[in-house]
Amino acid sequence: MGKNKKQRRKTAPAAVKAAPDYKKYIGLFLIPLAFFAVEAFSWVFLRGSSGTKWPLVFGLLWAVMLSAAVLGMPAGAGRIAFGVVYGLAAIYAVVETGYYILFKEMMWLSDFRYASEGSDYFSVLLSYPVHWWLGILALIGLGVAAVWLFPRGKYNWNQTVAAIVLFAVAGNFAYRLPYEQFDQDKDVKYARSDYGRMQSLEAAYENLFNTHRLYQVCGLYQTLWKDIYTHNIYPLTPAYTQAHEAGREEIDAYFAEKDKPQKNEM
């Protein structure tokens, strides 16, 4: 009898260790859900009268890409990366939706420098729809839960390789998908005229003439990426600053040479 009790005591810890780690699986589910929730929250307010669902498709692809990126890192680094990326994306979504509710337009990142001028409109926030505020609270809650339940464990290369493959596949779809939509441009009135071309999806995506039109083509995440990449918005590294300074000196030297009086040979 006593021997059986000892055996049960020895096997109990092993049984506990063998139990599924539900916390890990919940964390794995919450990370892509949180990233997609940012796009879904934006879509509710930014879809406009067209009601296009393309932003949700792109949001799903970007949720896969970003989840693969953070889950492919060691647990500690991945958790920090998730918190930073998700936090910035959520703030971007809140600012863009808030601006759109007020002005029916979206902003480029370069317009954010004038955000301080909007302090006069703070009182208007009280009149914003309740579901906008509830959506913000939901984003905060999802972010906190995902950080808290972020999967922990030993780092292994298989995880990174799988993440790279997943990122590459989703990224390939996100890159090609806008071009699949351009067939709709043939239905635009006066499609061959300059006016028609400016109304086309291709012009919205390639020329970036309007932030909201770009969003309707490719969603919030890809709009943000296109804005950063096309408008060269990135940290001013020492190399960039040095190259910029060299270019400025070259231009100054050119105009200084032009200002010198030229000898008339006649």
Model regions and ranges:
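Membrane-embedded segments
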Residues: 253-256, 260-266
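Charged, flexible boundary elements
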Residues: 245-254
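Short linear motifs in intrinsically disordered/low-complexity regions
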Residues: 3-5, 22, 260
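Transmembrane and membrane-interface helices of multi-pass
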Residues: 10-11, 15-233
